[in-house]
UniProtKB/Swiss-Prot annotation:
<dbReference type="InterPro" id="IPR020094">
    <property type="entry name" value="TruA/RsuA/RluB/E/F_N"/>
</dbReference>
<dbReference type="GO" id="GO:0031119">
    <property type="term" value="P:tRNA pseudouridine synthesis"/>
</dbReference>
<dbReference type="InterPro" id="IPR020103">
    <property type="entry name" value="PsdUridine_synth_cat_dom_sf"/>
</dbReference>
<dbReference type="GO" id="GO:0160147">
    <property type="term" value="F:tRNA pseudouridine(38-40) synthase activity"/>
</dbReference>
<comment type="subunit">
    <text>Homodimer.</text>
</comment>
<feature type="binding site">
    <location>
        <position position="109"/>
    </location>
    <ligand>
        <name>substrate</name>
    </ligand>
</feature>
<keyword id="KW-0819">tRNA processing</keyword>
<comment type="similarity">
    <text>Belongs to the tRNA pseudouridine synthase TruA family.</text>
</comment>
<dbReference type="InterPro" id="IPR001406">
    <property type="entry name" value="PsdUridine_synth_TruA"/>
</dbReference>
<comment type="function">
    <text>Formation of pseudouridine at positions 38, 39 and 40 in the anticodon stem and loop of transfer RNAs.</text>
</comment>
<dbReference type="Pfam" id="PF01416">
    <property type="entry name" value="PseudoU_synth_1"/>
</dbReference>
<dbReference type="InterPro" id="IPR020095">
    <property type="entry name" value="PsdUridine_synth_TruA_C"/>
</dbReference>
<dbReference type="GO" id="GO:0003723">
    <property type="term" value="F:RNA binding"/>
</dbReference>
<dbReference type="InterPro" id="IPR020097">
    <property type="entry name" value="PsdUridine_synth_TruA_a/b_dom"/>
</dbReference>
<feature type="active site" description="Nucleophile">
    <location>
        <position position="51"/>
    </location>
</feature>
<keyword id="KW-0413">Isomerase</keyword>
<protein>
    <recommendedName>
        <fullName>tRNA pseudouridine synthase A</fullName>
        <ecNumber>5.4.99.12</ecNumber>
    </recommendedName>
</protein>
């Protein structure tokens, strides 16, 4: 049978999602825990591989097993055998044609900036920090130039291995909630560092260094060197993955849980 899981994790102490030799990864910890529950080696496939320091509240994985377990056994059993900064949120049996990566129709990220003169102590690894004033309305205005199907070369890491820089941006919203600024981005898929590179450029607009129209110019320039700096990893969360309804996956609060689900 094939099982899908929803995963939440704090990426601070991991070298990204993907299992790698000699370094700590989220995938490795999850697979070790699931292998204990299944009593056989388990390998998972994920919806999107996150980089070192990046968090997830809506990661989705699947794995195959011939072991008959109640769904609660997968959630409770895995959580009992994992570090406390990784948690399984739900488990459900899925059709054999389901694939966590290839069945996904869209991914959604939130980038969170603590916009205050002083850095935070408690959430220091869960948010990015910018000390000067940021104009979230101008940042939102700038982000609208990225909507639709575009060539995102200017916002793509130089070592990105994706065959094409073209992606379809479904929404990009920038909102303020007290001292928190949230950049909420949804697209069919993302090139490497796309959200963090867009965020770095939006911060330049929010600071007043650039006008909102600059983002349109960056898009047309197709040159990574002229765009803003890559924003830090700690503010970024993979919060949701869309799938066709017939797969019947659970819908959970998007998160991260210190923010309201609906930010409008």
């Amino acid at each position: 049978m094939k099982i899908a899981l929803g995963i939440e994790y704090n990426g601070t102490h991991y070298f990204g999602w993907q299992r790698q030799r000699d370094v700590k990864s989220v995938q490795e910890e999850l697979e070790k825990a699931l292998s204990v529950v299944a009593n056989h080696p388990v390998e998972v496939m994920c919806a999107g591989r996150t980089d070192a320091g990046v968090h997830g509240t809506g990661q989705v994985v699947h794995f195959e097993t011939n072991v008959d377990r109640k769904m609660v056994a997968w959630t409770m059993g895995a959580n009992a055998n994992m570090p406390k900064d990784i948690a399984v949120r739900w488990a459900t049996e899925v059709n054999e044609d389901f694939h966590a990566r290839f069945s996904a129709t869209a991914r959604r990220y939130r980038y969170i900036i603590f916009n205050h003169a002083l850095r935070p102590g408690i959430l220091n690894s869960g948010v990015s920090h910018y000390h000067g004033h940021l104009d979230e309305k101008k940042m939102h205005e700038a982000g609208q130039y990225l909507l639709g199907e575009n060539d995102f070369t200017s916002f793509r890491a130089t070592h990105c291995q994706s065959r094409s820089p073209w992606r379809n941006m479904i929404h990009l919203n920038v909102t303020r909630h007290g001292h928190y600024i949230v950049i909420d981005i949804k697209a069919n898929a993302f090139v490497h560092h796309m959200v963090r590179n867009i965020t770095g450029s939006l911060i330049a607009v929010g600071k007043g260094d650039q006008k909102p129209e600059w983002i349109q110019w960056l898009l047309e320039a197709k040159d990574r060197k002229v765009a803003g700096a890559t924003a830090k990893a700690e503010g970024l969360y993979l919060v949701d993955v869309d799938y066709p309804e017939h797969f019947g996956l659970p819908r959970e609060p998007i998160g991260p849980l210190f923010l309201p689900d609906n930010l409008n």
